[in-house]
Amino acid sequence: MDLWHIFLERILVACRVSASVFANFGCGLYSSWKLICGDHDSASGLRAGLATPTQRGKATGDNGTTGTPARTIGKPQARIATAMSTATCARFCTPLSSGTAGSTSKLTTGNGSGNTMTSAYKIPSNNSTTANDSSNTETTFTFKLGRSNGRSSSNVASSESSDPLESDYSEEDPEQEQQRPDPATNSRSSSTATTTTTSSADHDNDVDEEDEEDDENEGEGNGRDADDATHDSSESIEEDDGNETDDEEDDDESEESSSVQTAKGVRKYHLDDYQIIKTVGTGTFGRVCLCRDRISEKYCAMKILAMTEVIRLKQIEHVKNERNILREIRHPFVISLEWSTKDDSNLYMIFDYVCGGELFTYLRNAGKFTSQTSNFYAAEIVSALEYLHSLQIVYRDLKPENLLINRDGHLKITDFGFAKKLRDRTWTLCGTPEYIAPEIIQSKGHNKAVDWWALGVLIYEMLVGYPPFYDEQPFGIYEKILSGKIEWERHMDPIAKDLIKKLLVNDRTKRLGNMKNGADDVKRHRWFKHLNWNDVYSKKLKPPILPDVHHDGDTKNFDDYPEKDWKPAKAVDQRDLQYFNDF
C-alpha cells in the first residue's frame, strides 16, 4: 500500500511539473508571436492599408492608383508597396523614448479608422549612456494614421500629456515653459509626427550635467563639433518659435488677407485670389491642392491644415515653426513659401508648385541610380544644407520622399515641419527610422550633424536602392544603426563609398560636415572634385532626369484623390483661435 502511495505521488508530481512546463512554453510562444507578428507592425505604424510586395524597387498599386513602396523592408530587394500620395506633406516620425536602455515603453496605435492598440518595446542597449537616461519610466505614445491606404510617413504621434503645448524642447530655449500661452501644443505641419515624453524625471535639470560630460568626450576626439565653432555667432541669430516683429505685423492684418512685398511692390493677398483645381496629396490633418493665382495666373501648391486636428494632435508649435522658417529662407533648392493665412477653420500655406513629383518615385522605378545621377542630386542637397546650417537651421527630415523634382530637373527640398533653429543642441525625438542618427536614438541631444548622417544614408540608398540600415521592425533598424555595421555592394563606386563611410560615423564630432570646416569638408571630398560649386548653385549642371510634364500645372506625377472624400473642417472657437493669432 505504501509503495502504491509513493508511486501515485510521483506520478502526480510529474504531471504537475509537465503541466507547468507546457503552460509556460505556451505563454512564451504566444507572447513571442504577438510581439513579432502582431504589435510591431501596428505599433510602428509602418504598414498602413493594402500592401503588395515589390521587386527591385518597382512600384505597384491597387485599385488603379499609382503605388509607391512604403519604408518597411523585409529584404533589400523587396519592400512593401502601398497605394499612396506623392504629397509634399507626407512624412512620419517613429516613436522613440528617452528612458534608460533596456527600459520598456508603451505604444498606443491607431489604424486610421479610430481604432487603437497598445504595444510595448524596449529601448536598445548601448555602451554609452547619458545623464538624462537615469529615469526608468514608461512613456505612452498615441499614433493616428493619416489614411488607411496612405504612406507610413503620414502618422502623427502625440503625448498623453494634457498640455497641448507639451512640445519638443532643446538646450537653446530652457525658458520655453514660461513662454507658453494657456493651452499649448506640440505641433507639426500636415501629416507629421513627433514624440514627447511624459517622464517623471525633469530633463532640464540634467542638461548642464550632460553638457559637461559630452564636452569632455568631444574634446577627446580628433574632430571638433562645428556647432561649438559657431556657437557664439548663432546666439544672436537664434529666435524662439518665430519672429516677434513678424507676429506683431500679422496681428494687424485680417485673418484671410495680408500684404506681402513683391518685386512689383506691395500686394494685398486674399484667399479668393486662389482657384483650387485639384487635390494632389492628403495627410493626417490636411491636404495639398494644386491651385492657380487668379491675378498672376501662376500655379502654386496650397497646403490646407484643419485647426481642430492641429490642436488635437498638439502640433501647433511645429506648424508655426515651419511657417516661420520657410518665411525666412530663400534658396534655389528649397521650396519657397509665398504666403500664409488662416480663417476660422483652416491654416493655409501657399508654396511653389513642383510638378515633377518625388525623387522617391523615380528611385523606386529605376531600382537604383548611377554614381553620376546620385552625385548630381547629392551636390544640390549639400548646397541647400550648407545654406540652412549657415542660418543655424537643422532640417532633420532628409529622405527621398521630401525631395521634389521640378520641371527643369532640379531638386526642391520640401516639408520643414521638423526643421528648427538651434544654438547648440535639441532633444526632439523625431525622424524616419532608416535615416535617424545614433545620437537621436540614444537621446543624447543632437545638432546639425544629424543632417550629414542622413545625407550619407541617402547617398547609399540612391546607389544601392535601399538604405544601409534596414529591418522588418523599426527597433531592429535602431539596433543596426547603433552597431554601425553596413553591408556594402561589391561593385559600389569606391570613392562614393569612402564619402558614405565618413558621413556615417557614430561619433558626431568626427562626422564629415560637422567638424571645424563644416560643409567645406564635404564639398572638397574626391566624389565632388569635378564640380564647380558656383555652377551647382546657379543650376548650370545638366539634370540626369527631366520629368514628363506638359505644362506648369500638370498633375500626372501625383495620385488622384476623389474630391468628394474631402469634408470641410469644423470651425474652432475663439479660445482655440488665439493659438494662431500670429499665423
Curated annotation (Swiss-Prot):
Residues of the Protein kinase domain: 274-528
> Which InterPro entries does the UniProt entry name for this protein?
AGC-kinase_C, Kinase-like_dom_sf, Prot_kinase_dom, Protein_kinase_ATP_BS, Ser/Thr_kinase_AS
Q: What positions does the domain AGC-kinase C-terminal occupy?
A: 529-583
Q: Name one GO molecular function term.
A: ATP binding
Q: Which PROSITE patterns match?
A: AGC_KINASE_CTER, PROTEIN_KINASE_ATP, PROTEIN_KINASE_DOM, PROTEIN_KINASE_ST
Here the segments flagged for biased composition (Polar residues) are: 52-69, 98-107
Ranges of compositional bias, category Basic and acidic residues: 221-234
Question: Which tissues is this protein detected in according to the database?
Answer: Expressed in embryonic mesoderm, and the optic lamina, wing disk and leg disks of third instar larvae. More abundant in adult head than adult body.
Annotated catalytic residues: 397
The entry's function note states: Does not have an essential role in development.
Organism (species): Drosophila melanogaster
The record's comment on protein family reads: Belongs to the protein kinase superfamily. AGC Ser/Thr protein kinase family. cAMP subfamily.
Q: What is this protein called?
A: cAMP-dependent protein kinase catalytic subunit 3
GO CC annotation, single: cytosol
Q: What biological process terms from GO does the record include?
A: cell adhesion; imaginal disc-derived wing morphogenesis; signal transduction
The keyword Cell inner membrane belongs to this UniProt entry's keyword annotation: no
Q: Which Pfam families match?
A: Pkinase
Q: Where is the composition biased (Acidic residues)?
A: 163-176, 205-219, 235-256
Task: Give a yes or no for keyword Transmembrane in this entry.
Answer: no
What broad class of enzyme is this? transferase
Q: Which UniProt keywords apply?
A: ATP-binding, Kinase, Nucleotide-binding, Serine/threonine-protein kinase, Transferase
